[in-house]
Amino acid sequence: MASSASKFIKCVTVGDGAVGKTCMLICYTSNKFPTDYIPTVFDNFSVNVVVEGITVNLGLWDTAGQEDYNRLRPLSYRGADVFVLAFSLISRASYENVFKKWIPELQHFAPGVPIVLVGTKMDLREDRHYLSDHPGLSPVTTSQGEELRKHIGATYYIECSSKTQQNVKAVFDAAIKVVIKPAVKQKEKKKKQKPRSGCLSNILCGKN
């Protein structure tokens, strides 16, 4: 029987600037896509959520991905229970930076904290008008996202669209499950104990 007292979970979103972290948080907390002013960083927010019969108080922390915030951003990592690490499915650079920048930063400042990997802007990956306006764009595929998840040891990989709200709730449900199901975390930790050798073909091989 679930306890009536809610468990507090601190969830911190990280990732390159302009990948849609703030939009995702606004969409999740307000159930609508922001069409007017979008702040650089979303105000900290907490909400009571029931996941699999367990009531949790989910605290959401947004962070700015730009280099100007490199010294301040890690201050938000203290006490984090889970990270939502986001990249844009239409930005190969943000995908590569998950491995090149964000994983090293999280391992340095918050080692051992579980990660949910998220590919944002899913709607634009199949948008013919958007793709025709951006010739040469190489969207990240689902299989490439899953390969990255395995390589960094993230517990889940989820693709979402804040504009259509598809899978936005699933992102944060997954973040909660990572914390309330320690057995899953232990299984993933065992996988991370033996890091893969060689390069990740879709991220680093053949790239500068």
From Swiss-Prot:
Keywords: Abscisic acid signaling pathway, GTP-binding, Lipoprotein, Membrane, Nucleotide-binding, Palmitate. Belongs to the small GTPase superfamily. Rho family. This is Rac-like GTP-binding protein ARAC8. GO terms for cellular component: cytosol; plasma membrane. Although this sequence has a C-terminal -CXXX, it is palmitoylated at Cys-205, rather than prenylated. Gene3D superfamilies: P-loop containing nucleotide triphosphate hydrolases. CDD domains: Rop_like. The gene is ARAC8. Interacts with ICR1. Binds to SPK1. GO terms for biological process: abscisic acid-activated signaling pathway; negative regulation of abscisic acid-activated signaling pathway; small GTPase-mediated signal transduction. Acts as a negative regulator of abscisic acid (ABA) responses. InterPro entries: P-loop_NTPase, Small_GTP-bd, Small_GTPase, Small_GTPase_Rho. A motif (Effector region) lies at residues 37-45. Its main location: membrane. It is a lipid-anchor. The keyword GTP-binding applies.
